[in-house]
Amino acid sequence: PIYHTHGLFTATNTVLLSGGSLLFRRKFDVNEVVSLFPLATSLMGVPTFYTRLLNHEGLTRDSVKHMRLFISGSAPLLAETHREFEEKTGHAILERFGMTETSMNTSNPYRGERRAGTVGLPLPGIEVRVTDPASGGLLPQGDIGMIEVRGPNVFAGYWRNPEKTAAEFRPDGFFVTGDLGSFDAQGYLTISGRGKDLVISGDFVEVLWFQGF
């Protein structure tokens, strides 16, 4: 939706600034979307778009031959969905991570490896770290913790709510996103879920694990 940062700033504004055109639809209708592929070059959507497209018999390599790019955001995309879509269409979905308070933070590369199950690498000028949700201490690579970001993309604070602003920022300027995740050895970030969804039971259980059932 265009009232979200992904739909407004990343999708709509960047296309218009580059002189492109947009095909706005009232809602996501999988039959209509498949029929519009010959008129488009890219699709920006959420993970449910791609799971529904995968179940459509009209999604083939031939039907997307005019397409240049498929982008997913706003929620984590299952690695299985990413792999199945690439097998069926030849296109590796470009997944990234952003939020209203920061706009885009990380992205899989346009040119380079788009790693399934990850939201890519920190964008230039943006610092991303993973910390212990309880202590705020920096966690080693591979450990799941709270994702924090710092950079010129981060907002100044919540409107007329200094208490919430103070609660969401670290003293060194990092913004606490509320999302849980981890880095792999190559620096790709994986989102595991929301901090508020965390169950304290001696270990972290990834929300995506449950969503796979």
Model regions: which residues?
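Conserved G/P- and acidic residue-centered "switch" motifs that form tight phosphate/ATP-binding loops
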Residues: G19, S74, G98, G120, ...
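Gly/Ser/Thr-rich phosphate-binding loop
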Residues: L17, F37-G45, L54-R115, E127
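Short hydrophobic/charged patches on amphipathic alpha-helices used for structural packing
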Residues: V30-V34, T51, R61, A166, ...
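Conserved ATP-binding/catalytic segment of the ANL
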Residues: G137-G142, M146-V205
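Conserved AMP-binding
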Residues: P1-H4, A75
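Short Gly/Pro-enriched turn/cap motifs at secondary-structure boundaries
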Residues: E113, G117-L123, L138, F169-D172
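Conserved AMP-binding/adenylation subdomain of ANL enzymes
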Residues: Y3-S42, Y50, H56
